[in-house]
Amino acid sequence: MAAGYDLAGRVCRELHRAGLSAYVERPGASKQPGVWVEVNGQGEHAGGLYVRWSAPELAEAGMRAVTERQDPAAPEWKRYAEVVLLIQTALIGILRLAGFSVVRAEEVDDVAEGDVYVHADAIGREDS
């Protein structure tokens, strides 16, 4: 796990260099807006990272609109979903430029939609 946290620190540094707020997610730590970097400690991709964008205000507005109006196509929800995809694309580009091996997290974990996955052997490996 120590190697995973080292990798998470390097990812956060690169995101900070690009002007983004980024934090390593740790148990019990409060969630902040920006990019969360979570170390994956299980399964065949153990040691890799999930990189997740957090915009609580935007997410809450989208979820509230869907819940209150019972409308999964609510404009507020669509806006949130589109922002998540735009940020995902930007994060992939930023991290690949820095030399990390990254993919859309859905390619590794089908329930991680909108996240980015950084492979454990991220530095020095060609991207797929």
Describe every region a protein language model picked out.
Residues 89-128:
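Acidic, proline/glycine-rich low-complexity IDRs
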Residues 1, 78-82, 109:
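A short, exposed loop/beta-hairpin motif centered on an aromatic-Gly-Thr core
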Residues 1-64:
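N-terminal leader/targeting segments
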Residues 67, 71-99:
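Short, hydrophobic/π-rich interface segment
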